[in-house]
């Protein structure tokens, strides 16, 4: 199905030259003279590169053949990550470039969304909020009560986030995976 210029918006998935992209940012421009156009920044699902593209009135782009599947992350083995389709129990192996930044939030057994383009896995999305255990952080000292103060904490997946001083090693916290920020302790 063709997508017209007027339908473009942030987050929309499009295909140009056989490559699937996500619109990261767009701006509708209406110059004093001439026809309106859309200037957009689009990110490739295949290599992660962001390019700027201008769409003119009448331009069309295709809707990509993308399928999102819920899969279970099994384990990491060298340079591959093993996933299992929770419906068919079929296993697939993805490399570092396919998994990307999601790897620092993934725990064995976690359910993730794997994006497939023409039946080939191209990216992995983790939940926006995950609960992870702190394996290393500096101890608290008396007087560390300033609410704005933060300290680095290493999580069980190896990711490092800034946490308030009252958070201790061994505690489980919720983290926003998009902003990489501490949200709260898990009770």
From Swiss-Prot:
Gene3D superfamilies: 2.30.30.30, Nucleic acid-binding proteins (2.40.50.140)
Keyword Transport (UniProt): no
SMART domains the UniProt entry points to: EFP, Elong-fact-P_C
Pfam family, one: EFP_N
InterPro entries: Elong-fact-P_C (IPR015365), NA-bd_OB-fold (IPR012340), Rib_uL2_dom2 (IPR014722), Transl_elong_fac_P/YeiP (IPR020599), Transl_elong_KOW-like (IPR013185), Transl_elong_P/YeiP_cen (IPR001059), Transl_elong_P/YeiP_CS (IPR013852), Transl_elongation_fac_P (IPR011768)
Keyword Lipoprotein listed: no
Listed GO MF terms: translation elongation factor activity
Disulphide bridges, residue numbers: none
Location of the protein in the cell: Cytoplasm
CDD domains reported for this sequence: S1_EF-P_repeat_1, S1_EF-P_repeat_2
Entry superkingdom: Bacteria
GO annotation, cellular component aspect: cytoplasm
Principal location: cytoplasm
Keywords of this entry: Cytoplasm, Elongation factor, Protein biosynthesis
Gene Ontology biological-process entries: peptide biosynthetic process
Family named by the database record: Belongs to the elongation factor P family.
Described purpose of this protein according to its UniProt entry: Involved in peptide bond synthesis. Stimulates efficient translation and peptide-bond synthesis on native or reconstituted 70S ribosomes in vitro. Probably functions indirectly by altering the affinity of the ribosome for aminoacyl-tRNA, thus increasing their reactivity as acceptors for peptidyl transferase.
HAMAP family per record: EF_P (MF_00141)
Name of the protein this chain belongs to: Elongation factor P
Natural source organism: Helicobacter pylori (strain G27)
Top-level taxonomy: Bacteria, Pseudomonadati, Campylobacterota, Epsilonproteobacteria, Campylobacterales
Gene: efp
